[in-house]
Amino acid sequence: MQPQIKDLYQKFKESSGISTDSRTMKKDNIFFCLSGDNFDGNDYAEDALNKGASLCVIDNPEFAKKSEKFLLVRDSLDTLQELAKYHRDKLNIPIVGITGSNGKTTTKNLLEVALSVKYNVYATEGNFNNHIGVPLSILKINNSHEIGIIEMGASSVGEIAELCQIAKPSCGLITNISKAHIKGFKSFEGVVRGKSELFDYLNKNNGQIIINNYDSTLVNFIKRFDNPILIEGGKSNIDVKISKSKDGLKLFEPNIFFMVRNLNSGLYEEKKSKLFGRYNFENILMAISVAKFFKIDEQESAEKICIWDMPPNNRSQVIKVAGSNIILDAYNANPQSMKNAIESVQNFSENEKVFIIGDMNELGDISKHEHSEVGKLTSKLESTECFFVGDKMEDAYKMNKNSRWFKTYNEMHDSLAKMRFQNVDVLVKGSRSLRLERIQTTLKKILT
């Protein structure tokens, strides 16, 4: 540990928090000057100081003499991470680490809801799940919190291992493993190796491993680690009991139902969840099972989750327009999440379907094959209009000649704006770079 971390930690305790963005920082924040490929964070140090920063952590010696409130370090990012590690060691609370190819953020949100029945919980905000976001999240945990939930993302082998050294999880869950970020991981085996770094850390540090035994890859981990907790429920997708009592979950594609106890009559009533789809069914099961590990009754978890609304973050949002539904799932996309979304929307209602599907990025050598598979899948569906968007989706178009392909978002938008639809379910899904959520305003106009 650098000698200055202890001193910096004292200044952190006296501050109003940490900031890495001078545009949003608050008075008395400590400002860390982080640099990227196209910017030097040190250039914003004086601006941060003028806005009330109590201290600026810089790593460019040329700035060192400009103010006594500039703290020169070897590397600002390394110092941020070391400060987070030091803070984590001071926190005497369990931290749940969550990673996986799909469903990390939704499962994190559901688990926060379930754990809040009994505990004061801090959970990663938004998608702060990388080498910058994880230390910032750890530094937001304070003495009032009783449990932390830290989401961990990765696009190459070794990244989860590094994040574990910062967050030091005492319990961990991998939601699932699929073909995501293949370009960085190099292969599916690389994805498996990278995601399993969470379990490796827990195994070495006497942490509790929780395995989603619905996932065919994760099932292979059951014998690899000692005493894992398995997500409860059988393989049936019709009726999965989550305890020995009458409470349970039911999946009638695509809807999820809870058996919730009526506090007045004491009887169990079937209530429809605000989430839908097989993938969210598993996300709910994982959240309830982890909460049970922390001594929270499944019925109490279910009652909270049953009334929970998906936040407006472009993930599995359902927007009702007249007799139509927009299913907005445009935060990101990979082969498995794309397949899940298409199949769930196909069963969503009796409406005809409109698919607006964008590129799946970071697939490396398997990109052409996986985009072609999307085309094959959609070609088998009846009563559908399919709009493919982006360079890579041309391969999908070639496999579905009844579809339409647009090289750019603007081309797709201009074509779609001239159309009219009634009583349809519209899926909007693609990688983040396309920002397909922009189409919702136009969709609301043409769904008349």
Give names to the regions the model predicted.
Residues 1-82, 86, 276, 346-350, ...:
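N-terminal leader/targeting and accessory segments in enzymes
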Residues 405, 423-441:
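Peripheral docking tails and interdomain loops at the edges
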Residues 3, 62-66, 173-325, 347-351, ...:
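Acidic, Mg2+-coordinating active-site environments of NTP-dependent enzymes
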Residues 29, 48, 83, 98, ...:
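Residue-level signal for inorganic ion chemistry
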Residues 98, 313-316, 433, 437-439:
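ATP-dependent carboxylate/acyl-activation modules
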Residues 4, 78-213, 217-227, 291, ...:
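Phosphate-binding loop of NTP-binding sites
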Residues 34-39, 310-312, 330-402, 431, ...:
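Active-site beta-alpha connecting loops in nucleotide-dependent enzymes
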